[in-house]
Design a protein with these regions (language model features):
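Conserved GNAT acetyl-CoA-binding A-motif
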Residues: 107-122
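A metal-dependent hydrolase signature that marks the N-terminal structural subdomain at the beginning
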Residues: 8-43
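A conserved beta-strand-loop-helix scaffold within acyl/acetyltransferase catalytic domains
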Residues: 33-88
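Acidic/histidine-enriched, beta-strand-rich ligand/metal-binding domains
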Residues: 91-93, 127-128
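Terminal substrate-recognition subdomain of acyl/acetyltransferases
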Residues: 2-22, 118-244
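Conserved acetyl-CoA-binding loop-helix of GNAT-fold acetyltransferases
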Residues: 92-107
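Generic recognition of long tandem-repeat/solenoid scaffolds
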Residues: 24-28, 50-59, 81, 211-219, ...
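Short, surface-exposed basic-aromatic patches at helix termini and helix-loop junctions that form
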Residues: 104-111, 132-135
Length: 244
């Protein structure tokens, strides 16, 4: 069990990218996990149109267990998640390596005053990202159609009301012409998708409600602060001395 009696939480090391770059990156140790001490390090960016970072999580033998790639575009207060992955042999084994990687990006949001962390989630990772407060952020009518079909086709008892909402909305979307209407219906679609995902998580039936396509998702700084106790508890759980 993490953060046991006698195990002192370890404070992350926060440093600037370089003396001319005010952005900050972090590294930290996860003490006495199920796999022993784990070491997380954010690597320096490569310059170009955007600044790409990679966060690596390794064990005491320096074996790479998981990583996340993300990017800042110049002069933007957004982060764009490119890829997050944990080694196949460590997935769904209770090691929570993906959770540790996600906590490093929460630190990145706070320390750099980031407004939005944007990702394109693959279908099998939507529930993972939702667990850490990412929300659907669909912005095109074609994506609305594609994702609403998943909800409409779900015949599981208890999900009829949400499926009905999705069906009515899709019928309305078919006649959409103006950009203003498109934006409105995308916002409504995001609400329905969030309701659907939340219900699946609350009933612990995610496997019975799979998505079959990618989804744009966003974690905002407002959402992080509203859920700071949730994230602070996760930092404590993993022995990371950090509070929002």
């Amino acid at each position: 069990m993490l953060n046991m009696i006698g195990i002192s939480p370890i404070k992350p090391i926060i440093t600037k990218v370089d003396p001319q770059d005010a952005r900050k990156i972090c590294s930290f140790v996860v003490p006495d996990s199920k796999m022993g001490d784990l070491y997380l390090e954010m690597k320096h960016p490569q310059n170009g149109f955007c600044h790409s970072f990679i966060t690596e999580l390794r064990n005491r033998f320096h074996k790479l267990l998981g990583y996340e790639e993300f990017a800042y575009f110049n002069d933007a207060k957004d982060i764009y998640g490119l890829h997050i992955r944990v080694g196949d042999e460590y997935q769904r084994k209770g090691y929570n390596l993906g959770e540790i990687l996600r906590l490093s990006s929460i630190i990145e949001i706070i320390e750099n005053k980031i407004k939005n962390f944007n990702i394109l989630s693959k279908d099998t990772a939507i529930y993972f990202h939702s667990k850490y407060k990412f929300k659907p952020d669909v912005t095109s009518v074609s994506d609305c159609d594609r994702l609403l079909k998943t909800v409409i086709e779900d015949k599981t008892p208890g999900f009829e009301k949400i499926a009905g909402k999705a069906k009515v909305l899709m019928q309305k979307i078919e006649s959409v012409k103006s950009k203003e209407e498109q934006q409105h219906f995308c916002e409504v679609t995001n609400g329905i998708l969030e309701e659907y995902i939340t219900k699946a998580i609350e009933t612990k039936t995610q496997k019975q409600h799979p998505f079959t396509s990618t989804m744009n998702m966003t974690l905002t700084d407002d959402t992080v602060y509203k859920n700071k106790e949730f994230f602070n508890d996760l930092f404590k759980k993993h022995g990371i001395d950090y509070k929002i």
